Amino acid sequence: MTSSNNSPQDDHQQALSEENSAPATEVTGGTGRRPLQTVFNDGRDYPRLSSFAFRRGTLTDNQEATWEANWPRLGKELDEQVNEQYIDLDEWFGRHADTIVEIGSGTGTSTAAMAPLETDKNIVAVELYRPGLAKLVGAVSREGIENIRMIKGDGVEVLQRMFRPESLAGVRIFFPDPWPKARHHKRRIVQTGTLHLIASRLRPGGILHIATDHAEYAEWIDELVNAEPQLEYIGWPEELASGADDGRGHLGQLVDRQLLTKFEDKGLRKEHTIKEYLWTKK
């Protein structure tokens, strides 16, 4: 599940895996059922969970009614019994447009705020935590946002099972759970295997954008920036921070973050340094 400390993002999207195309097997732990994890056999590291209890949030009556009225159109859920169920993005959005996937959208505050700034893009928010998705469903319904869709499921499994290779213009991972304890580092979403999987889903020229305010996690990511040969690491060029075009032209879609996420704002108030990472698919 991909998450951020002591917040709804603790229940995000980092349920994760080992690696590759061996048959998927359902894994259960404790008294609760946890998401299926694909077993990959390519020697790379993939985020995974051993035992983890998902927070069970409840919806208000209004949220439940809004969910029932809008989820069939706006949302999908990972079917853990199906190995591959690739989404027809054109049909789902009712148009052909570049698609950006946000892994671990949390409560969707920044997702809903950014979408009107990029109406020419299809945005797919992936989140495991239903109350977080319910808040985003409410915002999309209330504000009439047309370019957001949602998937309830683990981020790695959703990428593996629901998106065709080379079908995405971008992937975003903003403020993932740093899993600070050493014994939990295997749960971090940024791993060699995840980078490989993301690269396989990006089309040539597609962008991977990661942001963190956790210093030790940034060091972890620093060690992996060149780990995936299909991705060219370009850092965070100064001209992009100022809103200029660096000549690549296609970068603006993912770097025009004019609004702070809840966790970014928290980090700034704590005087944490926010580090941004950008890669392009070769």
From Swiss-Prot:
Q: Where is this region: Disordered?
A: 1-42
Q: Which residues form the active site?
A: 177
Any single GO molecular-function term of the entry would be:
tRNA (guanine(46)-N7)-methyltransferase activity
The UniProt keywords, alphabetically, are: Methyltransferase, S-adenosyl-L-methionine, Transferase, tRNA processing
Describe the reaction catalysed, as an equation. Answer: guanosine(46) in tRNA + S-adenosyl-L-methionine = N(7)-methylguanosine(46) in tRNA + S-adenosyl-L-homocysteine
Question: InterPro entries recorded for this chain?
Answer: SAM-dependent_MTases_sf, tRNA_(Gua-N-7)_MeTrfase_Trmb, tRNA_methyltr_TrmB_bact
What CDD domains does the record point to? AdoMet_MTases
Q: In which pathway does it act?
A: tRNA modification; N(7)-methylguanine-tRNA biosynthesis
What protein is this chain from? tRNA (guanine-N(7)-)-methyltransferase
**Biological classification of the source:** Bacteria, Bacillati, Actinomycetota, Actinomycetes, Mycobacteriales
Q: Which gene encodes it?
A: trmB
